[in-house]
């Protein structure tokens, strides 16, 4: 599936998280091991300044992160207001979430309810749960692939 272009300013910091060998030209390709432009342990505080990132591409990486709250909070912390987060995650509606032995968190489309400001779950629980992330949902689709794999695709906009 081809990536939908994300409109952002020229020369802006754009992160391709969990890039593995799928480097994107013009983006900062990030992984926990080489080859990557930045080697980082994303389970810790991320090595970018607050409000410094114009876009994040996160395809098939968030399921490798133990804490959904930490991951989404760090995305929000480093993103500029209006920055776009492009997510692509296998969901528990299919086998993709469970087939890879390195997956440690399991996602459904409803998980976004806790990070998107228009949902009652975010409004009721974000303070109690320690969720500082606040997004608007620009686009969300749930896609079926061969071998009973379902994936969530979402474009979220950072709200500050």
Predicted regions and their residues:
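Conserved alpha-helix/loop element of class I SAM-dependent methyltransferases that forms part
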Residues: 1-12
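Generic detector of short, locally flexible boundary/turn motifs and exposed helical patches
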Residues: 2-4, 20-23, 122-123
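S-adenosyl-L-methionine-dependent methyltransferase catalytic module, highlighting the catalytic core
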Residues: 66-76, 80, 84-160
């Amino acid at each position: 599936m081809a990536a939908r272009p994300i409109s952002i300013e020229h020369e802006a910091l754009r992160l391709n998280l969990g890039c593995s060998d799928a480097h994107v030209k013009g983006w900062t390709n990030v992984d926990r091991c080489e080859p990557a432009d930045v080697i980082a342990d994303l389970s810790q505080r991320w090595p970018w300044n607050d409000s410094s990132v114009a876009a994040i591409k996160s395809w098939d990486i968030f399921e490798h992160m133990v804490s959904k709250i930490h991951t989404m909070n760090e995305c929000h912390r480093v993103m500029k207001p209006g920055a776009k987060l492009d997510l692509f995650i296998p969901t528990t509606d299919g086998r993709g979430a469970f087939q890879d032995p390195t997956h440690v968190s399991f996602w459904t489309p409803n998980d976004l309810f806790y990070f998107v400001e228009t949902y009652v779950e975010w409004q009721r629980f974000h303070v109690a749960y320690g969720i500082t992330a606040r997004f608007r949902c620009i686009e969300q689709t749930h896609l079926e692939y061969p071998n009973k794999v379902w994936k969530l695709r979402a474009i979220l906009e950072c709200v500050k």
